[in-house]
A protein has these predicted regions:
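Active-site-adjacent segment of FAD-dependent monooxygenases/related oxidoreductases
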Residues: 66-70, 74-157, 176
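N-terminal Rossmann-fold NAD(P) dinucleotide-binding loop
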Residues: 40-41
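Conserved dinucleotide-binding and phosphotransfer motif residues
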Residues: 50, 160-162
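Extreme N-terminal leader/targeting segments of oxidoreductases
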Residues: 1-32, 46-53
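A conserved short coil-to-beta-strand element within the FAD-binding core of flavoproteins
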Residues: 168-181
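General small-molecule cofactor/ligand-binding pocket signal
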Residues: 91, 165-167
């Protein structure tokens, strides 16, 4: 049929995620999200919680490492992840709980330290008050997690949501909308 997208969703290299084969016809999805990075997956989960049927299309194979752009998740994003039920699993991922998160500027890799931005380690994130973002009144402080760890966790939560269809190895090259959607 002219109005259907057909794609076989391959099993990602992630142990406990099984994706389904997808055949999505016009009208079976309310929203098309292009890109299964952190923003696309978060949007899909949020819409699905509200009963919106979402199809997420990604050019990469699921589980393929991303071109990393994220290394630190803000408090506001963590609050949203808390609302979506994914914050606890994100907090457990990334750097070890006692690993220093400070940002240091040096003249060279082993050169003179110019300045340091203190960021509490994961185990002290809720209690420590030293650093640029520790005084905020928030139930979810910022979290240091690289996108290579963040994305698989978001994918795992997104695929578990009713109303979310994930299609990988598919590139959107054109989009047409008419009076019917």
């Amino acid at each position: 049929e002219k109005d259907e997208i057909v794609a076989e969703v391959v099993k990602p290299e992630l142990p406990d995620i099984i994706l389904r084969k997808s055949k999505v016809k016009s009208g079976q999805s309310d929203v098309l999200v292009v890109g299964a990075g952190p923003v696309g997956l978060t949007l899909a989960m949020d819409l699905a919680r509200s009963g919106v049927r979402v199809t997420v299309v990604e050019v990469r194979r699921f589980g393929e490492p991303p071109n990393v752009k994220c290394n630190h998740v803000s408090a506001r994003s963590m609050e949203n992840f808390r609302r979506l039920g994914v914050a606890p699993s994100l907090r457990e991922a990334g750097l070890p709980e006692d690993y220093p998160n400070d940002v240091v500027f040096r003249t060279a890799m082993t050169g003179t330290e110019l300045t340091r931005i203190p960021i509490p380690c994961r185990k002290n994130r809720y209690t420590e008050r030293g650093g640029p973002d520790t005084e905020w009144d928030t139930p979810e402080p910022p979290h240091r997690i690289n996108q290579i760890y963040l994305e698989p966790l978001l994918l795992k939560h997104a695929v578990a949501q009713d109303g979310v269809t994930l299609i990988n190895r598919t590139q959107v090259t054109d989009f047409v909308q008419d009076e019917h959607g």
